[in-house]
């Protein structure tokens, strides 16, 4: 699962017994060599889908981590690209990724639930971060994103279809979430990371309540399941003009 340059089991255990912020500070130097980093195939598929509605002027990578989404935004944005995350360690790694050419790039340490921006962006993207938010936090999070988008701006992120019940993937995610719930019941500070808490129906409903118009776009690069449904979709939430 992890390469020789990735974190050891001991390092992962220390991270898991820390807060989310401290845990990612510790993991940051080796994060890109773990399966937690968003795969390049997902980043490329999202960039290709968004190119059809671009270009954009200013983009924001929400919960940017080590900056994997930077390549997506620099392909799409002409003016500036901003990454925001509350882990100083992850931002430190991200700063080393800035290309020599392209739009202006800035990194901001802040909590996604209290973004320090006005309506300054035409595009907000996020990759693999929503498991760190409890369902009750989604309304506030989406309201924050709505507030930093200009009229007509888009909030886009990929969503993979959940594993079928009784498959190995289903039991793995169910077991992971169960372990995290036990850990958080017994240990402080909590480490919020739940793979099964981000349900597409609930997400769409909360986005619409926050004032977005929501569209689901299949990502054809990942094919379809036996029932014909897409294996991966991109959620595009647009702030009305």
What kind of feature is each model-predicted range?
Residues 186-200:
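Acceptor-substrate binding/catalytic loop of class I
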Residues 60, 66-114:
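Class I SAM-dependent methyltransferase SAM/SAH-binding core
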Residues 139-151:
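A short glycine-rich, Lys/Arg-flanked "PGG" loop and its adjoining helix->strand segment in the class I
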Residues 212-223:
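Conserved S-adenosyl-L-methionine
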Residues 1-54, 72, 156-180:
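Conserved class I S-adenosyl-L-methionine
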Residues 125:
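A conserved beta-strand element that flanks and buttresses the S-adenosyl-L-methionine
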Residues 223-241:
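Core SAM-dependent methyltransferase catalytic element
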């Amino acid at each position: 699962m992890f390469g020789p340059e990735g974190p050891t089991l001991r390092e992962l255990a220390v991270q898991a017994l820390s807060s989310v912020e401290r845990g990612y500070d510790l993991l940051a130097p080796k994060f890109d060599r773990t399966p937690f980093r968003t795969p390049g195939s997902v980043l490329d598929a999202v960039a290709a889908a968004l190119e059809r509605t671009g270009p954009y002027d200013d983009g924001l990578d929400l919960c940017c981590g080590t900056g994997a989404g930077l390549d997506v935004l620099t392909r799409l944005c002409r003016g500036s690209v901003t990454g925001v995350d509350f882990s100083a360690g992850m931002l430190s790694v991200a700063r080393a990724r800035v290309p020599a050419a392209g739009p202006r790039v800035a990194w901001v340490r802040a909590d996604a639930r209290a973004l320090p921006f006005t309506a300054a962006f035409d595009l907000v993207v996020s990759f693999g971060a929503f498991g760190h938010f409890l369902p009750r936090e989604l309304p506030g999070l989406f309201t924050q994103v709505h507030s930093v988008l200009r009229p007509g701006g888009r909030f886009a992120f990929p969503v993979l279809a959940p594993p079928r019940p009784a498959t190995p993937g289903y039991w793995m995610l169910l077991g992971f979430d169960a372990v995290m719930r036990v850990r958080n019941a017994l240990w402080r500070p909590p480490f919020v990371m739940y793979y099964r808490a981000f349900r597409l129906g609930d997400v769409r409903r909360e986005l619409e309540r926050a004032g977005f118009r929501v569209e689901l776009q299949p990502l054809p690069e990942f094919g379809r399941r036996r029932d014909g449904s897409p294996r991966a979709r991109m959620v595009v939430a647009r702030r009305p003009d």
